[in-house]
Curated annotation (Swiss-Prot):
A zinc finger (Phorbol-ester/DAG-type) spans 98-148, 186-236. It is found in: Cytoplasm; Membrane. Activated by DAG and phorbol esters. Phorbol-ester/DAG-type domain 1 binds phorbol ester with high affinity and mediates accumulation at the cell periphery. Phorbol-ester/DAG-type domain 2 binds phorbol ester with low affinity but may mediate initial contact, resulting in a conformational change allowing previously occluded domain 1 to anchor the kinase. Phosphorylation on Thr-588 is then also required for activation and may also result in a further conformational change. This is Serine/threonine-protein kinase dkf-1. SUPFAM superfamilies: Cysteine-rich domain (SSF57889), PH domain-like (SSF50729), Protein kinase-like (PK-like) (SSF56112). Its EC number is 2.7.11.13. Changing K455Q: Loss of kinase activity. The PH domain inhibits PKD catalytic activity in the absence of DAG, either by direct steric occlusion or distortion of the PKD catalytic cleft. Changing T588E: High basal kinase activity, loss of phorbol ester-stimulated kinase activity.
Length: 722
């Protein structure tokens, strides 16, 4: 996008959506408009992976039409306010190979390889495929998702060449590939009682019991044990007519709302995170457990999802069978990888190459060192089962050792990096978010198995003047001296030559995620008040310590449980926090503009009162699901326009006291802005129901009360046992 977009009003825009990512893009009419939108969409997608093997298309949402998505083929189809969905389709589609079947009579109990149910009857209970030897019900052999897995079977067609084709669509407007091939959609599993003998799709064992023997996918009908559900591949395909027409008007649709306010969405962070192509290693490996050296096993090893997966089956051209997993070794359970320089455990076998030691005291002995085998060369393994050149034991040893290390550079202080790696296993493909200078990953504490959050800060992001490094150290210093139930806890810090690792407690989501997950895109007053009091109590603690957060927003309010309407909250991300004594002001650039008061945006002096403005914006976006201000007008003018600030929808459903509190917080004059104490004493944040909700949380947490007081017990006439 060129610089001219900086002055474009939000009134002329489109929204690009990809999964959970949503970005508002100004719309400028010219010949290259569609190309520019496609380029921006490509940049969004590339932040999540590589596009080399997939085609990208834009589809327009039409909520009032039986066809919910329409492909964009020309710029004339795009109107202001349109919501454009980014769709990816694999360039090489898997060939659809039908089964070649004939009736079969079975002399022993046999189960359908498609649905898992027993083939019943006296004669000709089912059909058998000549190519793959699969056994099916007659009705299952022709099912749309039942594709013959035999390589070279009749009917196989060559893959489409990897070039950009025109969009192949059905009469409903969807890409053919998107409808005919699995897309990694997760299953929706529910308990099910089976009237016929049925086997598990993962382990092929019978689902036993009288009722509720297993789980059945609501959409595609696959059956699994409860214990096998985690191993079920995410390859669900919705059955026909599973998606029905929406019978309501989506508030995001063009022209569906009379309000000009900007819908709430996740604002881009200060640090752009882009997924990098991770090198992979896979191949057949010989291994055994040290306690059982006689049992030599060969499995197809694959490193994925921060764990080593050991598969029973692998076929060239098809790959591994995801349903045949022998064992999964999480990296977080590996304590060390040690090269073996000793003798063989058993004299009749060659010595193993290296050992993988785990927290469960299991030692995996991997590979066979024929060079160290004394007493003559061993019997050679058949060529078809030998270790592939790209997956020899030396490469696996180095790869696992590197995977156990935190994301770092070679010139890092090795001693510090080793100390950190011994304590924590960073799950580098599990990104939680990003802050001012670093990326936050999920990690596992090795000795306890506890999941934590690790912020990995690259010192390359800091300016040469060192202000960035000082800011980072100031953030850590603030976290080290704070101790409050409403503030995220710092557990550990480690600094190397090139990186800083900050370990904090991990929560399960943030306030913005909770708001956007609601059906109406906003919270009700009861939940809002419950969360707000927690935020204010934590903020009061910070202000009493002389600390201003300076970047308060829903993204920086973490929640303990996304499944609860009344979770505990904790404030995080102190990258912009400042020590501001009483009667002093600062002028440094801080925070996220959408939540900052005018004095910060205009580079005037600000004090801790800027956090109270942010609280007002948080209340507004939580109750309405929109931002309070547009960029096209002065904030002071918008505040004077009550009909603009508080349109009938949805503010007619909100108590007038809530509107009064927002107006007293969103004061342009710093002196007129409400303080924390005044805010907590406001009538909207009083009431027996709110008191009960807060007291219940304190009892659940089993901590000293910090949200209510004994005076509240007397005031509301309810004494709750501490």
């Amino acid at each position: 996008m060129d610089g001219s977009q900086g002055s474009t009003d939000y009134g002329d825009h489109v929204v690009l959506r990809y999964g959970g990512t949503r970005e508002m893009v100004p719309l400028i009419r010219h010949e290259q408009m569609l190309d520019m939108l496609m380029e921006r969409a490509r940049q969004i997608v590339q932040g999540f992976g590589n596009l080399d093997t997939r085609n990208m298309y834009l589809f327009r949402h039409e909520y009032n039409s039986p066809t919910l998505l329409y492909p964009i083929t020309s710029a004339s189809q795009i109107t202001s306010g349109s919501i454009l969905e980014i769709i990816l389709v694999d360039r090489t589609e898997a060939a659809v190979i039908p089964h070649v079947v004939e009736p079969e009579s079975y002399m022993r109990p046999t189960f359908c390889d498609f649905c898992g149910e027993m083939l019943t009857g006296l004669m000709r209970q089912g059909v058998k495929c000549k190519n793959c030897n699969g056994n099916f019900h007659k009705r299952c052999s022709n099912a749309a998702r039942n594709n013959c897995g035999a390589p070279g079977a009749p009917g196989a067609q060559p893959s489409r060449p990897p070039i950009l084709p025109p969009i192949p669509t059905t009469p409903t407007g969807f890409p053919v590939a998107a409808l005919s091939t699995p897309t990694g959609l997760p299953h929706t599993l529910i308990e099910h009682s089976y009237r016929q003998f049925t086997v598990c799709k993962v382990c092929d064992h019978l689902l036993v019991g009288l009722v509720k023997q297993g789980l059945k996918c609501r959409d595609c009908g696959v059956n699994v044990h409860r214990k096998c559900a985690m191993e079920l591949a995410s390859n669900c395909v919705l059955s026909e007519n599973a998606i029905s027409r929406v019978n309501f008007t989506d508030p995001e649709g063009p022209g569906s709302s009379s309000s000009d306010n900007i819908p709430l969405f996740r604002l881009p962070g200060q640090v752009g995170t882009r997924a990098t192509e991770k090198k992979k290693l896979e191949g057949w490996m010989m291994h055994f457990i040290l306690s059982d050296p006689e049992r030599r096993l060969k499995h197809y090893w694959m490193m994925q999802s921060n764990a080593i997966h050991l598969y029973n089956e692998y076929s060239e051209g098809i790959g591994v069978n995801p349903n045949r997993v022998y064992r999964i070794i999480p990296l977080a359970e590996i304590t060390s990888v040690v090269q073996n320089n000793g003798k063989s455990v058993l004299a009749k076998h060659p010595p193993h190459c290296f050992e993988i030691r785990t927290t469960t005291n299991t030692v995996f002995c991997v590979g066979e060192d024929y060079h160290a085998f004394s007493g003559g060369p061993p019997k050679k393994i058949p060529r078809s089962m030998s270790v592939r050149p790209s997956s020899n034991t030396t490469m696996w040893f180095q790869f696992i050792k590197e995977s156990l290390q935190p994301p770092s550079r070679n010139e890092d202080n090795a001693e510090q990096a080793l100390e950190f790696a011994n304590l924590y296993q960073v799950l580098s493909d599990k990104t939680l978010g990003s802050g001012q200078f670093g990326t936050v990953y999920s990690a596992i504490q090795r000795h306890s198995g506890k999941e934590v959050a690790v912020k990995v800060i690259s010192k390359e992001r800091f300016s040469k003047k060192g202000s960035g490094a000082e800011s980072m150290r100031a953030e850590v210093a603030i976290l080290q001296q704070t101790c409050h139930p409403g503030i995220v806890c710092l557990e550990f810090m480690c600094e190397t030559k090139d990186k800083i690792f900050v370990v904090m407690e991990k929560m399960n989501g943030d306030m913005l995620e909770m708001i956007l997950s609601q059906e109406l895109g906003r919270l009700n007053s009861r939940a809002t008040k419950f969360l707000l009091v927690q935020i204010l109590c934590a903020l009061k603690y910070l202000h009493d310590q002389g600390i201003a957060h300076c970047d308060l927003k829903p993204e920086n309010v973490l929640l303990s449980d996304m499944g609860s309407n009344f979770p505990q909250t904790k404030i995080c991300d102190f990258g912009y926090a400042r020590f501001i004594p009483e009667s002093q002001f600062r002028k440094t650039v801080v925070g996220t503009p959408a939540y900052l008061p005018p004095e910060v945006l205009q580079r005037k002096g600000y004090n801790k009162s800027l956090d109270m403005w942010s609280v007002g914006v948080i209340i507004y976006v939580t109750l309405s699901g929109t931002f309070p201000f547009n960029e096209g007008e002065e904030i002071s003018e918008q505040i004077q326009n009550a009909s603009f600030m508080f349109p009938t929808e949805p503010w007619s459903e909100v108590e007038p006291l809530a509107v009064d509190l927002i107006q007293k917080l969103l004061k342009v004059e710093i002196e007129a802005r409400m303080s924390i104490e005044q805010c907590l004493d406001h009538g909207w944040l009083k009431g027996e129901q709110l008191y009960r909700d807060l007291r219940d949380l304190e009892v659940r947490l089993n901590t000293p009360r910090y949200l209510t007081s004994p005076q509240d017990d007397i005031l509301y006439g309810t004494l709750v046992n501490p």
